[in-house]
Amino acid sequence: MPGQRRSGAKAGRTGRWAALAFALAAASFASCRGAEGGAAPATGGGGEGGEPIEKKPPAPIQYGEGKRIAHLANGAIDESSGLAASRCNPGVFWTHNDSGGRPRLYAFNRKGESLGVFDVRAGAIDWEDMAAVKIKETSYLLAADVGDNFSLRGQYALYWLEEPEVAEEEKPAVPRRLDAEAIPFVYEDGSHNCEAAAVDPATGAIYLVSKRKAATCKVYTLPGPLAEGWPEDGYTAGEPARAVAVATLRIPTVTAMDISPDGRRALVGTYADAYEYARAEDETWPEAFGREGRRLAMPARRKGEGISYGPDGRAIYLTSEYAPCPLFEVPVLENKADGKDE
């Protein structure tokens, strides 16, 4: 696939990430590596005497009315298509532009202030979404080059990279360079337009939701670099990954997706409202997507294609494909039955 690049050695995942770490150090900036953490694996289990544990999703969060809280100061962000809350830089968000833009990530804070520009060594046919995830002790970003309005592309690409540290102020203003692991892939059932991608922190699996004007859409999954099933030497354009359909959702025109930092909730966004799915501790996401999503009213916005849980995994943030780019917040009603896990 044009523009795809693979970082690191070809002697296995360990060698590739060692090479990537060296490249990051040579570029004089650090990635976000911290203490052991992340979501617990989604596995089956039992109570005393081996009795199965009841599948009980977390209680619903009560959200308040969404409103615009800022405009993004960086005027280059004129088609914010993906949005993600940092897993290691407190109060930092990430976004990127839609098709026609460079493979570039923008960092900003809740006030809309620019905190840096980062060029990714990757291809960029039509970036449509991104995700942030913390797996064990390291935070990662995923950029999804998956747009295909006319379903003509034979192959698509995801770009996986360690999340860099971001300063509280934008310096230097010159874009910094980031290496990325390319994940070329195909769908098991042909070409699809897609604008929604997320990563499960419990398993490292990547989820994609197709964009259709019909009443339904499909959820697909494929392994990420840290997931079970990832080949030792990764994937290539000649041997791409295969995205497999695992669920059908009764939602038209899906434009965005996110999975909460604890791996228990998923948002599926549209140009209007969003739908929230909750996963019990012993459930898989395909099982959780088998239930109806909870419809959430989102603030009115023009061409809203970015959605993300906040850093705490509770409040919801949104952007729009217009300049100056607005930042919306849907807060949590703390004095209500706020949905804390039991």
What is each residue range found by the language model?
Residues 7, 28-31:
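Serine residues within intrinsically disordered or low-complexity segments
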Residues 32-342:
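Sequence/structural signature of beta-propeller domains
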